[in-house]
Amino acid sequence: MPTAALHISWFVVITRWGQWKKITERLAALGIRHFIPESYNTLVFLYTEKERALNLVNAGEVKGRFVVDHGTRTLLEVPEKQMEDFIRMVTEYPDAECTSQVPIVKGTRVKVVRGPLKGVEGEVVESPSGIRLVVRIPTLIGASVTITRGDVRPLEY
């Protein structure tokens, strides 16, 4: 009796900063195909069956949370061709800028992920020239600089 073919797809997990090396080692040891973009290494793309992806996160092999497709309210599945193109782009062009599709709007708490202010946390304010990062000492003083969206990530991610 023939068995149904397994549906393998790309699933996306958001992890904490600095976890990518451990996750890469675990997934390699388990023989699971995956991709972690170097310039946005809180995203882990898993190429596996949905049930196995769920088990990896539930068992703590990959610590994080899945990205959900808000239209279908199911785990986001990245189409094969789209993932191949993305991997090719960021592999062949290491300076390609990976930017979050999460809107960074006035009031968003962010962390600087590259450049001389890497590691600094602050709040985004809008200005005519783009966005500014503000670091405040409440009720006393605040300092701000113009910064590019690609240099910051929302803190909740």
Name what the model sees in each region:
Residues 104, 113-120:
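Short coil-to-beta-strand transition motifs
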Residues 118, 129-131:
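Short loop/turn segments at connectors of secondary-structure elements within structured domains
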Residues 1-109, 124-127, 134-157:
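Acidic-enriched and Gly/Ser
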